[in-house]
Amino acid sequence: MNGTEGPNFYVPFSNITGVVRSPFEQPQYYLAEPWQFSMLAAYMFLLIVLGFPINFLTLYVTVQHKKLRTPLNYILLNLAVADLFMVFGGFTTTLYTSLHGYFVFGPTGCNLEGFFATLGGEIGLWSLVVLAIERYVVVCKPMSNFRFGENHAIMGVAFTWVMALACAAPPLVGWSRYIPEGMQCSCGIDYYTLKPEVNNESFVIYMFVVHFTIPMIVIFFCYGQLVFTVKEAAAQQQESATTQKAEKEVTRMVIIMVIFFLICWLPYASVAMYIFTHQGSNFGPIFMTLPAFFAKTASIYNPIIYIMMNKQFRNCMLTSLCCGKNPLGDDEASATASKTETSQVAPA
């Protein structure tokens, strides 16, 4: 084995020279230079500075403006809430531990940090699944008279939390475990060991199949059908130009969210699967640290995409920030089709 396994950790460094210490007790500067830990802390500080205001602003603007409280926006707000969980439950912890060079909060703190990071990521993934299904039902109309309403949105939000908890909670109760990963300053699922005492192998397989592969299949199926339907409707002119444009804009926004999710999380998932299927292979702490920390950027890209691609929300945000006055004037604010309201478009 090219790493050192302890009772509640796995350090990707051989202990032949006897330098390996518990990541809960002493700085891990034998894994990387102190300045590299400082860089991680600076990166986490940047994510906190960007992630908290932009996600809080998303919630605040939606609460302040009643016209933004549409069923589709419930799912988008769910993403903002999940991102705030990651900021407060994960990023602040990782910032502090990176400054100290090891996970100073012990195994209990590791469980909490790993839980919040996993919970936030899974809520994001399952929210994209719900959005994909919503787009499929609204645009493709497999049920001709179906309208995506408030009750459906609430059920969708509840579903994302149930599925996310089904992934994030088991390591807290004995099925797998959370351990420090990479440079030992943040925690995640144990992909490094089989750990039969906690049935680690079965949990990792369950997680990759149920909480990554199946959601991806659903998302790609829905958008494959959706692209075909949009092209067909455009060719046959089955709906008004305004409706088609609104549907396309919402669909484009959600597809971009999916693409950014894959950009953020696919490297982490790929490296985790490689480590799990090549246990005992030689890899350094940076190998897992970079994708793990890069995945954390997911907390800021969704609200940015939402603000940039949703004209109605952008105008409401400017109105809130400018004390009730929109500096762009009333013309843009009264633009016809709101992208977040297209989930209520009746079937043609």
Swiss-Prot record:
<dbReference type="GO" id="GO:0007601">
    <property type="term" value="P:visual perception"/>
</dbReference>
<feature type="transmembrane region" description="Helical; Name=4">
    <location>
        <begin position="153"/>
        <end position="173"/>
    </location>
</feature>
<dbReference type="InterPro" id="IPR001760">
    <property type="entry name" value="Opsin"/>
</dbReference>
<dbReference type="GO" id="GO:0016020">
    <property type="term" value="C:membrane"/>
</dbReference>
<dbReference type="GO" id="GO:0001750">
    <property type="term" value="C:photoreceptor outer segment"/>
</dbReference>
<feature type="modified residue" description="Phosphothreonine">
    <location>
        <position position="340"/>
    </location>
</feature>
<feature type="modified residue" description="Phosphoserine">
    <location>
        <position position="343"/>
    </location>
</feature>
<keyword id="KW-0807">Transducer</keyword>
<dbReference type="GO" id="GO:0007186">
    <property type="term" value="P:G protein-coupled receptor signaling pathway"/>
</dbReference>
<feature type="binding site">
    <location>
        <position position="201"/>
    </location>
    <ligand>
        <name>Zn(2+)</name>
    </ligand>
</feature>
<keyword id="KW-0966">Cell projection</keyword>
<dbReference type="GO" id="GO:0009585">
    <property type="term" value="P:red, far-red light phototransduction"/>
</dbReference>
<feature type="topological domain" description="Cytoplasmic">
    <location>
        <begin position="225"/>
        <end position="252"/>
    </location>
</feature>
<dbReference type="InterPro" id="IPR027430">
    <property type="entry name" value="Retinal_BS"/>
</dbReference>
<dbReference type="GO" id="GO:0010467">
    <property type="term" value="P:gene expression"/>
</dbReference>
<keyword id="KW-0600">Photoreceptor protein</keyword>
<protein>
    <recommendedName>
        <fullName>Rhodopsin</fullName>
    </recommendedName>
</protein>
<dbReference type="GO" id="GO:0016918">
    <property type="term" value="F:retinal binding"/>
</dbReference>
<dbReference type="GO" id="GO:0097381">
    <property type="term" value="C:photoreceptor disc membrane"/>
</dbReference>
<keyword id="KW-0479">Metal-binding</keyword>
<dbReference type="InterPro" id="IPR019477">
    <property type="entry name" value="Rhodopsin_N"/>
</dbReference>
<dbReference type="InterPro" id="IPR017452">
    <property type="entry name" value="GPCR_Rhodpsn_7TM"/>
</dbReference>
<keyword id="KW-0675">Receptor</keyword>
<dbReference type="GO" id="GO:0045494">
    <property type="term" value="P:photoreceptor cell maintenance"/>
</dbReference>
<feature type="binding site">
    <location>
        <position position="279"/>
    </location>
    <ligand>
        <name>Zn(2+)</name>
    </ligand>
</feature>
<dbReference type="GO" id="GO:0016056">
    <property type="term" value="P:G protein-coupled opsin signaling pathway"/>
</dbReference>
<keyword id="KW-0297">G-protein coupled receptor</keyword>
<feature type="transmembrane region" description="Helical; Name=3">
    <location>
        <begin position="111"/>
        <end position="133"/>
    </location>
</feature>
<feature type="modified residue" description="Phosphoserine">
    <location>
        <position position="334"/>
    </location>
</feature>
<dbReference type="GO" id="GO:0000226">
    <property type="term" value="P:microtubule cytoskeleton organization"/>
</dbReference>
<keyword id="KW-0862">Zinc</keyword>
<feature type="region of interest" description="Interaction with SAG">
    <location>
        <begin position="330"/>
        <end position="348"/>
    </location>
</feature>
<feature type="transmembrane region" description="Helical; Name=5">
    <location>
        <begin position="203"/>
        <end position="224"/>
    </location>
</feature>
<keyword id="KW-1015">Disulfide bond</keyword>
<dbReference type="InterPro" id="IPR000732">
    <property type="entry name" value="Rhodopsin"/>
</dbReference>
<feature type="topological domain" description="Extracellular">
    <location>
        <begin position="1"/>
        <end position="36"/>
    </location>
</feature>
<dbReference type="GO" id="GO:0050960">
    <property type="term" value="P:detection of temperature stimulus involved in thermoception"/>
</dbReference>
<dbReference type="GO" id="GO:0001917">
    <property type="term" value="C:photoreceptor inner segment"/>
</dbReference>
<feature type="glycosylation site" description="N-linked (GlcNAc...) asparagine">
    <location>
        <position position="2"/>
    </location>
</feature>
<feature type="topological domain" description="Cytoplasmic">
    <location>
        <begin position="309"/>
        <end position="348"/>
    </location>
</feature>
<keyword id="KW-0812">Transmembrane</keyword>
<comment type="function">
    <text>Photoreceptor required for image-forming vision at low light intensity. Required for photoreceptor cell viability after birth. Light-induced isomerization of 11-cis to all-trans retinal triggers a conformational change that activates signaling via G-proteins. Subsequent receptor phosphorylation mediates displacement of the bound G-protein alpha subunit by the arrestin SAG and terminates signaling.</text>
</comment>
